[in-house]
Each structure stands twice: as C-alpha cells, then as structure tokens.
Amino acid sequence: MDIPQGGVIMNHFALALRGLNCMGCARKLERQLNQDLTVEIETLTPTSIELHTHATLNEVLTSIESLGYQGGTEQTYQLQGLNCGRCVNKLTTHLSAQAEIAKLHVSKERLSLVTTLTAEQVKALVAEVGYQAIEAEQESTFAPAASIDEKETDTPDAENSSNTEATEASSQTLSLLIKGMTCASCVASVEKALLSVEGVQSAQVNLTEQSALVRGIFANPQPLLNAIQSSGYQAEILDDPAQQQAKQQAQLEALQKEHKQSALLGIALGTPLMLWGVFGGNMMIRNSSDQMVWGGIGTICFALLLTAGRHFFMNAWQALTHGRATMDTLVALGTGAAWFYSMLVVAWPQTFPDAARHVYFEATAMIIGLISLGHYIETKAKSNTNRSLQALLNLQPQQATLVTEQGDQSIAVADIQLGMSLRIKPGEQVPVDGVVSTGHSYLDESMLTGEPIPVLKEAGAKVAAGTLNQDGSLVITATGIGAQTMLARIIQMVRQAQSSKPAMARLADQISSVFVPVVVVIAILSAALWYLYGPDPKASYMLVVATTVLIIACPCALGLATPLSITVGIGKAAEMGILIRDANVLQTASQVDTVVFDKTGTLTLGKPSIQSLHVLQGDENQLLALAYALEQQSEHPLAKAICDYAKQRNISPVEISQFTNQRGRGLLADYQNQTVLVGSLAFMQEQGIDLSMAESTLEKFAAQAWTPVAVAYRGMLQGVLAIADPIKPTSAQAVRKLNELGIHTVMLTGDHTSVANAIAKELGISQVIAQVLPDQKAQHIQALQQQGRKVAMIGDGINDAPALALADIGIAMGSGSDVAIESAQMTLLNSSPTSVVSAIELSKATLRNMKQNLFGAFIYNTLGIPIAAGVLYPAFGFLLSPVVAGAAMALSSITVVSNANRLRWSKISFDQHSQ
C-alpha cells in the first residue's frame, strides 16, 4: 500500500528476512539500507522488516542481498490460459508494473516471483489480464531442498516442455483427515467422491489412519471437502504432519471412549438377559404380566439403541441416503429387526403362533455391546500402528537455542529462519537441518538411519533434524527448515507410502465394495427360504437367520486386512532407516530373486584412500611431498586420496613449476629443474620409466585389486602408492545372507574386470559384469529381466539412475545423488548393504501378514455366512445364535488387527530394534 509522506508517494513494504542471526545483523542491515536508499523503518527484527521508501522492491532487495541476506516471500504458481509468447509478454508487462513484485519470471506454464503481496492478490493480478494462477506446491520427496529448488526453477527452455511434465511438476499432494469411515465400503465411497473432483489425479484413502492423500492440480481445495461431505462424511485439510498426527490421535481416542461406553452399556444390559435365558428363564410372551415385564425391558433396549447404538443407525441412514450400504447397515438392520420383532410380539402376541412368541432383546443388547467392544479393542490397536510415525514426529524439539551477539536466546523451532546460527548442547536433539560451523561432537543418527554407531560431526559436516547430540557442543547454520528438513520429508514419504495400496489390497477393496449389498441379499434370501420351507415357528426362525447373517458378516475385517499390514510394515521399515516410496514395492520386493549391486559407494565406501606405500628412492615424506605437490592441482578422484593422506601425515608439498596435466594419464611438473611424474603405470612406461624394480610389489597390489599410482623423479621410479576404495564393513554380511536366502547376487560396475573380480571373490558375489559404461547399465538390467529374473538394483550415483528406474525394484543409498534417490522406489538412509537384506525380509514378512489377514477374513466370511444362514440345521439341527454371531464378528476384526501388529515383532536380519 502506498502512503503520502511530505507530499510525495512512498512505497510501503513488509518483508520476511532470512540469514540474519541477531539484532546486530539487523542493525547492520539498517545502516546498509540508509546508505543505499532513503528509508523510514517502522519495525525491524532478524526475521522481518517493515519500511517506507521511494525505492522499488527490486532496489530494496538488492540492498539486502548485498550483505548476503535475503528478503521477501518467494511464490510459485502454475499458469493456465497462456498459449504463446505474446501472452507471456502481456502478463510480464502487467506484473512488472507492480512495485511490490521483484525477481519476476513468467513462462507459458509457470510464474515465479518475490513479492510482499498475498497469494490471493497475485492471483487477482493475473486474473486481471485474463489468465489463471494456481499455487504450485512441489510434492514432498526424499531429496535435499536444493534439488527440489532446481526442479522448480524455470529455464529458457521451459516453454518447450511437454504439458505432461508441467502438470506433474505442479501437482499438489493434500492430506485430509476424514471422519465417519467404518469399513471398506466407506473407503470405496470416499475414493470415488474424491476422484470425481476436477483436477484430481489420484486419491489414496486409508481406513486405519482415517485419512486420504489426494494428488492433483487444485485452484481451490474446497471442492474436495464438498465431495466428501456430499458422500456423507466429514473432512478437513491438514498440512502440518504434527497437527495431523495429533488430530488423528484425538479422533482415535474419542472413538475409543465412545466404543468403550457403548460396550459397557450393551454388555451390562445384555449379560443378565442372556443368562436369564441360558438358565431357563422365561423369554416367551404368554400372558399380560409377561407383556408388561418384557415391554419395560424392550423400552430400556430402545433407549440403548438410541444411545450406545445411535452411531450404527445414524451411519446406516447416512449411507442409505447416499445410495450405499456399509458395515453399520448390517448392524443396524440386524439389531433393529431383532428389537422390532420382539416389540411386535410384546404388543400383539395373539398375532403370532405360540411357539413364535419368543423375544430377542438380549440379542439386541449383546450385539451392540460385543461389536462395540470389538471396535474399542480394534481402535486401541490402530493407535499402535501409527507408533512409528509418532516416534518420527517426536524427534523434533519444540525449542532451540539461537546464537546472537547479545548471547544465546531460546527460540521456537517454528520461528527458525535459514542462515540462523543455533547452538546444540550435549543431550539435545538437532532442531533443523544444518551445517556445523564450530565445535565437534558425536551424533546419534539411529532414529533416522537405523545405524546404531554415533557419527562424528565437525566443522563443515551436515546434520539432520531429529538426530541426538551426545557429549560435545556444536554451533550449526540452518540450511533446511520446516517441510524441507530431511525429517519432514521422511515423515511425508512414510505417510504417502502407508496410504498407497499394492495390487492385492486393491483387489480386496473391490471385493469389499460389493460385500455389504451381497450380504443383505443373502440375508433376505435366507429369510425367505426359512419362511417358505423352514419348521415352525417360521417367523421366529426367519428373524433369527436373517439377523445372524447380517451380524456375522464382517466387511470390517476385509477392509482392515491389508491397510493395517502396510501401515505397520512401512512404519517398521522407517524405524530401520528404510524409506519405501509406494506400498507396491513391498509386494514386488518379496518376489526378488536377483540383487544387482553397483560397486562404488554401494559395496565400497566411495572414498578412495591410500592402502599401502612402497618407497624405492629416498623416504616416504619426500615421496609424499612430491606426489602432493602435483596432485593438489588435479581434479582426478584419486588425487584427493593422496592429498588427504599427505595432510594426515602433516606433509607439506614442495614448490613446483611448469605443471602439466595429461588428462587420464598422469601429471608432469618441474622441481629443482628436474621433471617429476605422477600417474599410472602406462604413463610411466610412455615416459621411459623402468618399473622392473617394483614388479613384485605391483603384483601384490594387483592381487588385492589396489590401483597403483607411481611417482618418478630425475628419470627414476621413486615409489608407488596403492589406492583402493575400501569395502564397507557390512558388504560381506549382506552378500552372505542374500546367498543363504537363495538370491542371485551380481556386481555391475564400470571398474576394471580384475578389480571387480577381486572384490566379488572377497565378498562372495556370484556374477560380475565389469567395465560397463554408464548408459549400458540399464541394458544389463534388462538382459537379466529377459532371463525371467525379478531384479533389484542397488546404486547411489547419477549413472545408476536409468538402471534403478528400469529394475523391478530400484534401491538407492541415502548418501547417493538426488537423481538416484528420485529414480528409486526404496531409499536406505544408513547406506548399508545389509539394509537390502532387511528390506527384502521385511517385504516378505509384510506380504505374508497381508495374505494371512486376507485369508482369515475370507475364510471367516465364507464359512460364517452359510452357517449363519442355517446350512448345518438339516443335518445337525444346529442354528447359530445372533449373540454368538456378534461375538464372532468382533473377534474377526480383533484377530486381523492383532495379527497385523504382530508384524512389528517379526525377526528381521540386521534389525537393531529386534535384536
């Protein structure tokens, strides 16, 4: 908003600030602004500034950035309606005229800017020239913030990108908390409602968490809420993972309380009635006194239906008005029919044959009580399935210590800005992602990576939110806050995976969606058959059979069979430092029979180091000083190993001149007017250096797959350094266990065959494919698949990305490149090969658990419904009681939930949590 000041219009800006650590920084900024511009500052803190100035926003931001700080709010939008370059120019001209907008970039599909305007104001400005802007939120994935920024930044070629790419890049993922779902039929209804909304690309509804993840392009999320409401449910959007978890927990606790009260009321009333009948008490209406007594009991039972059973009837009615049937429909029909029949008998006994004047009030009460008890136990168990996610959320502290010029200050984690300096004291958890600026300490990263050994952190080392500082004190600079911390991305990835569904689960959902209507039809047909062909009293038998069929059928068990197993399995994987992108991975990983390892960074540490030093002339220090002098000017991967080794030995490089790098062969330079050579054996031979004196040493190096780097001076070989990429301590364990499981192991590497074979022999790898160019790795994966193998590829580099994407399962090391991680369906945060074994075993255990749950649910319903319909009566005279049916229904759900939670205690190799 512009205001007049001394007769001159001045601009008013309220800007967010980043990079300022204290009020000293703020005062420094104030001096810079007054030096560069004419400003009147109203308020100034390390995180915000409000000022009046004649300058434009661009000029203000330039002044702020001259000190290394950042100001303003970055906003990104997906654009619709721009068809050509003229449209882009039109919008650019219109927005450029706004003083509150800076750093503007417009393409046909995308708008990015820094502004003091709100999102609604920006959308309104875009609408003024006939276009539409939609806020673009990149889907959270396990990738560093920098890589996300790179993906979202437009390039000059952005206009030529396909519409598909633009759509995918701008997709939002919204988390919804849903209230009112009770069974798989509800899940199907909610998914159908969400998918009917324009712009929705996918919808994943989770019965266990009472939540939904919706992906698509939304100008306004309100239609999603309207669609759910029109289906008879309630929903709200939750962006904050901690808030979502808290609300889900509160919802579960409220349901527990409701089910507990209903169970107590139902069982308290039903138990004496049932015992009265069991021990020979009269439950027939024979005279007026029976009518009075049972009429009173019927009234009490009606009150029970209005209180403890109220939610069954309300949910059933709501489902009916929306043209569907749910588990509540079955309970409401069964208990309602039993009560209504009994009241008819009480009111007009003369209309029924003597043998049919039996009342079933005990069935009404006990069914409500037992099913509510089952729901209570089930809901309590559900809250345990989210324990892994809650543990992740609990890792981030609420307060942090901000380092300022005035001393340390306590600050809320939500108020931390990028660039702030934070002190991490012994025993404290790291509040945000950052880089260590001063201090050193060991950090326990086991809660994120599953790796129990603390990791040393010194200046320059990266730290992640949620890790635990041990005995030292650190000062870190915040580099990732809020949703961009590794912890937040892990939580989002786990939540998405838990809401996804493998093929087996989708099949179960399809069956569940038609289950209730089929059961209602079976109940009606059974009642008709008993009425037509059953013994007297027909009406009584008809009621018992129909009620029992309705009550015993349990879509709840079917609906929970797979989501619970997935939630527990993926949660356990997260505890072990294994991130799973989609639940389908569990099903595929359980079928893997071939594991392909990249070598560098996967089986090895990816950090070449000196393994041995053989001196022929002079001493070690002179040899290292010569090698260090040349290698410090090289970019070769092995050069760093030599330089680091020399630094560790406190060796100083000699002064050289005339440095020459013969790329891929070796290095030359002059030292004291004599030539120094450092490089490969082939390079030495080209330069006429005699290697025969080191022949036995070189053979020894070759046998151990060490790479020799020779050093020559004055035309004579001075010595040889052996360099190798050390094998990870856990690689041999992983390969040995995979071989025990009958899984074929393969090493796929670009390294020399001799080196690859030596490492494969040491580790016990079955097959070696060496000297493979980066673009050929995917071809070798395809060749293995053509042999009928189910292939898992494990890699960490950019060159592994195509192979990771092509494999049946792509597994990326958490220490690897962002491209590799994005191409994989699974990420190992601890970068340990043993986690591959754990992931495969856990996938098999989860799939086995899902099959057990589905088998149990199907068998229960397949046997229970016919028995309830009375198929055993002609041969054995046995007819199931509605009360027993209610108990069986409750027990089936409890069994499924308990079996899913049993997965938490499965013995998985190399799992520190189960040792």
Curated annotation (Swiss-Prot):
Write one Gene Ontology MF term.
ATP binding
Q: How does it sit in the membrane?
A: Multi-pass membrane protein
Indicate which residues the UniProt annotation says bind Mg(2+). D796, D800
Q: Which GO terms describe its cellular component?
A: membrane; plasma membrane
| Keywords, in A-Z order | ATP-binding, Cell membrane, Copper, Copper transport, Ion transport, Magnesium, Membrane, Metal-binding, Nucleotide-binding, Phosphoprotein, Repeat, Translocase, Transmembrane, Transmembrane helix, Transport
Instruction: List its EC numbers.
Output: 7.2.2.8
Reaction catalysed by this chain? Cu(+)(in) + ATP + H2O = Cu(+)(out) + ADP + phosphate + H(+)
Cite the CDD domains for this sequence.
HMA (cd00371), P-type_ATPase_Cu-like (cd02094)
Q: Which Pfam families match?
A: E1-E2_ATPase (PF00122), HMA (PF00403), Hydrolase (PF00702)
Residues the record lists as binding Cu(+) 1: C22, C25
Q: Where is the active site?
A: D598
* Membrane spanning residue stretches: 265-285, 293-313, 329-349, 359-379, 474-494, 514-534, 541-561, 801-821, 865-885
Binding residues for Cu(+) 3, per the UniProt record? C183, C186
Quick one: which residues bind Cu(+) 2?
A: C84, C87
SUPFAM superfamilies (UniProt xref): Calcium ATPase, transduction domain A, Calcium ATPase, transmembrane domain M, HAD-like, HMA, heavy metal-associated domain
Cellular location of this protein?
Cell membrane
InterPro entries noted in UniProt: ATPase_P-typ_cyto_dom_N, ATPase_P-typ_P_site, ATPase_P-typ_TM_dom_sf, ATPase_P-typ_transduc_dom_A_sf, HAD-like_sf, HAD_sf, Heavy-metal-associated_CS, HMA_dom
Q: Which domain of life is it from?
A: Bacteria
UniProt domain HMA: residue ranges: 11-72, 73-134, 172-236
Residue spans of biased composition, Polar residues class? 158-169
- Which family does this protein fall into? Belongs to the cation transport ATPase (P-type) (TC 3.A.3) family. Type IB subfamily.
Q: What does this protein do?
A: Involved in copper export.
NCBIfam families assigned to the protein according to its UniProt record, in alphabetical order = ATPase-IB1_Cu, ATPase-IB_hvy, ATPase_P-type
Could you tell me what this protein is called?
Copper-exporting P-type ATPase
Question: Which species is the source of this protein?
Answer: Vibrio cholerae serotype O1 (strain ATCC 39315 / El Tor Inaba N16961)
